Each structure stands twice: as C-alpha cells, then as structure tokens.
Design a protein with these regions (language model features):
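Short secondary-structure boundary segments
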Residues: 98-99, 135, 208-210, 226, ...
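Bacterial N-terminal signal peptides
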Residues: 9-21
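An extracytoplasmic/periplasmic, membrane-proximal ligand-sensing/linker region
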Residues: 32-34, 176-180, 262-322
Length: 322
C-alpha cells in the first residue's frame, strides 16, 4: 500500500514538473505571431488613439505587432465580452477594458462574468471626464447650463457612450440632485459624440474633455468631474468644488481571457508598462485629457472585484436594471 501511494505521489510530481516545463517553454517562445488587441470604442476616439500608442510601445518590446480591432458597443463592454466568450487563453487576443464591464452584468443579462472570466493584466490610464458645449452656445457657466435644463425639462440633449455607462450614471446623479430631466443621446464612442456636437445635433457632450477642440475655441468646458481641475482646463470648476460631492475617475487597461499562463501575463504586463515611461504615450494622454494610472495585474484585479460590488449597489440604488 505504501509503495502504491509513493508511486502515485511520484507520478503526480512528474506531471506537475512536465506542466511547469511546458508552461515555461510556451512563455519562452511567446509571442510567435501578431496579437489582436480589441478596442471597445470607435476608431479615432480618445480610447482608440491612446490604446494604439500603447500597442505600438508594447509591439516594440514584444517584437511582434499588436493588431488593433475596434469592437464598439454595449457602452464599451463588447470587446471584453467577445474576447471572454470566444478567445483562447493563449495570449493572442487581448482587450482594452473600461469600467463598464463591471457594471453591465448588473444592468442586463450577459454571457460572461468580468471577475471570473477575465485575466486582469495591467491598468494604464484614467479618463478626465466633464461636460462641454459648443463655444457659440449661450451657456458660459455650468450654473447657466443647469438653470436652463431645469427650466426646460427634457429639452437639453447630451451625447454619451450609452445607457449604463459612467457618463450616463453621473449625469443622472446630477439630475437627481438638481431636479433636472435631460435627454441622453447614445453614441458608440467619443469620436462620434464630437461630430454630433460640432454639427449641432446635441447640445452638450459628456466624456473625455477634448483638449484640442477646447484650445482651438470650438468647444467650451463647463465643468469637470475629477478630484482636481485638469491643467488644460483650469478655468472650469469641478463638481466637487460646486458642492456636488461627486468625483468620477474611470480607469481603463488591458485584460485577457481567463486561464492565461502567469508567465505570459507577466510578459504582457511588462510590455505595456513600458508605455507609462514612453514620452509619446504620456504626451498623447495629456493631449486627450487622460491621466496615467498604473495598476499591476494583482492590484487591477482587486480593484475590479471591489468595484464590481460598488457598481451592483449603484445600479440597484438608481433602478437601472433592465
């Protein structure tokens, strides 16, 4: 009997050793071909632009090209959802992942769980959100804008990435506080929202404050949503300054399918982390109105797990479940 147990232990040990050797060999040869990076918004938007620059940096480190594929939809959750359901955990399909993936399962029925079905690799940046209008609009301040909206229920239209996104929820929170009813007009990304605002199809835009349009005198920033005023928009107050008690920070990073080899995860983490030291990437973030926001894979996963519950409570409190 003792001999049988000894043999079983030996066999198990050999199996573990072979598995470790196979994993090591796989990681040593990785990557052997181009890697697909799914972007959750339309081409030409802020997340698309910053992600492409990060992908270029990672490509140089890895020695293989990251091929960007735009998968807009579901308020930014479609890319990660498609990856989680269809991709093999071999490191050749990744997704840029916004906070929407943590909220969507609480709003509607989805076919994946972002906590158990994703590998959280690295967080890279966070959005500087705010509300902007055209420079020729009649509203010079946030107070003027909200006064008009309150006096004209449902008349003010604003562009957002869709129902249940951080932008939609924050505008609803503001509306609850101020007794305002406004009309959300959903688009697949900021690029489309910018076009709509420039064309006069909506009255305001919520999202990453487009610095270039502000500096060119095309748009005017009425309010920002961060902890402090962005350097490029120092003339616009924050919601916090105005007494709302609302601070919105929405990180985004890179995830993969569940079950990825930890050695490959580290290779990818280190490749993308190089972007946070790259002048071109940092300059791009500044131009787009984003902040560098690093979280390691472990920290990113812990953050996701905590915020998954926070989002559940928010959806329940605001009655957003469909």
């Amino acid at each position: 009997m003792a001999k049988i147990i000894t043999n079983l232990i030996r066999t198990a040990a050999i199996g573990l050793a072979l598995a470790a050797t196979s994993s090591h060999a796989q990681a040593q040869g990785y990557p052997e071909r181009p890697i697909a990076l799914l972007i959750p918004y339309t081409a030409g938007g802020p997340t698309d632009i910053s992600s492409r620059v990060a992908a270029d940096v990672a490509s140089r480190v890895l020695g293989k090209r990251l091929v960007v594929e735009n998968r807009p939809g579901a308020g930014g959750a479609l890319a990660a959802s498609n990856m989680a359901q269809n991709a093999r955990p071999d490191g050749y399909t990744l997704a840029v992942t916004p906070i929407t993936v943590l909220r969507l399962p609480h709003i509607s029925t989805v076919a994946f769980n972002p906590i158990t079905d994703l590998t959280w690799i690295i967080n890279l940046a966070g959005y500087q959100f705010g509300v902007v209008v055209r420079a020729d609009s009649p509203w010079k301040t946030w107070q003027e804008f909200t006064a008009y909206a309150k006096a004209n229920p449902g008349k003010v239209t604003y562009a957002s990435p869709g129902y249940g996104t951080t932008l939609h929820i924050t505008m609803e929170r503001i509306g609850e506080r101020d007794g305002i009813k406004w009309t959300q007009v959903p688009f697949k990304g900021t690029a489309d929202s910018v076009v709509a605002l420039r064309g006069g199809h909506v009255m305001a835009l919520t999202g990453s404050v487009p610095s270039e349009q502000i500096e060119a005198g095309i748009f005017r920033t009425l309010v920002t949503w961060g902890e402090r005023r962005p350097v490029r928009h120092a003339n616009a107050p924050t919601l916090k300054e105005l007494g709302y008690g609302i601070v919105t920070n929405s990180p985004y990073g890179v995830t993969g399918p569940k079950g990825m080899d930890p050695a490959i995860v580290k290779i990818l983490h280190d490749a993308f982390k190089g972007a946070l030291d790259d002048p071109a990437f940092l300059k791009t973030l500044d131009r787009l109105g984003h902040d560098p926001f690093y979280m390691s894979g472990d920290d990113y996963f812990r953050w996701a797990r905590e915020n998954y519950e926070i989002e559940r409570r928010t959806v329940e409190r605001m009655g957003l479940k469909q």
